[in-house]
């Protein structure tokens, strides 16, 4: 889905409001919810949206939300030198090994990262013809996320998703 659990967005907004990042990159931009949150709570932030499914860029007018939009897979994005990296419901769309490798790259360059991810079994296939919507690892748990991703300093769980803030 190009969107995610809206119950966790106030937590993300609070973190972004307190942080006031100079730069932020949103992987899995989808319909641009995190970009909109950044625009509202930290309007001076330079934002980059990264979306693997090109039709979403036009459908959701991502170029109107972010300062820059890239169409590519997060796993091949060239650098992560941002104050804030957002993984808004994308890590479940790749293998655990790929998610860990991506996290390790981010932890060497970014200052902070936010993860939003289902914490209950959440199978999902292709949606609206988008093969990237499939959940490759659909059984993450809160405990597994805490054990897998280094640097987590704050978290909040909701019925379906967990939100995690990491500092590097």
Short names for language-model regions:
Residues 105-109:
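Conserved helix-to-beta-strand junction in the class I
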Residues 86:
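A conserved beta-strand element that flanks and buttresses the S-adenosyl-L-methionine
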Residues 90-93:
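Hydrophobic adenine-recognition pocket in adenosine-nucleotide-binding enzymes
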Residues 123-127:
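A short acidic, helix-capping loop that chelates divalent metal ions and anchors anionic groups
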Residues 95-99:
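Short N-terminal helix/helix-N-cap motif within the alpha/beta-hydrolase-1
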């Amino acid at each position: 889905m190009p969107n995610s659990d809206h119950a966790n967005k106030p937590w993300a907004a609070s973190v972004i409001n307190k942080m006031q990042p100079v730069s932020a990159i949103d992987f899995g931009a989808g319909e641009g919810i995190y970009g909109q949150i950044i625009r509202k709570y930290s309007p001076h932030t330079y934002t980059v949206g990264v979306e693997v499914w090109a039709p979403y860029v036009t459908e959701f007018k991502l170029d109107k939300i972010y300062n820059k939009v890239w169409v590519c897979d997060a796993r091949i994005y060239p650098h992560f030198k941002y104050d804030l990296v957002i993984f808004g419901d994308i890590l479940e769309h790749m293998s655990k090994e790929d998610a860990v490798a991506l996290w390790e790259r981010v932890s060497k360059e970014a200052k902070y990262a936010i993860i939003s991810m289902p914490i209950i079994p959440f199978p999902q296939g292709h949606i609206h013809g988008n093969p990237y919507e499939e959940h490759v690892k659909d059984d993450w748990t809160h405990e597994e996320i805490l054990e897998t991703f280094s640097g987590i300093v704050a978290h909040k769980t909701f019925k379906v998703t967990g939100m995690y803030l990491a500092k590097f």
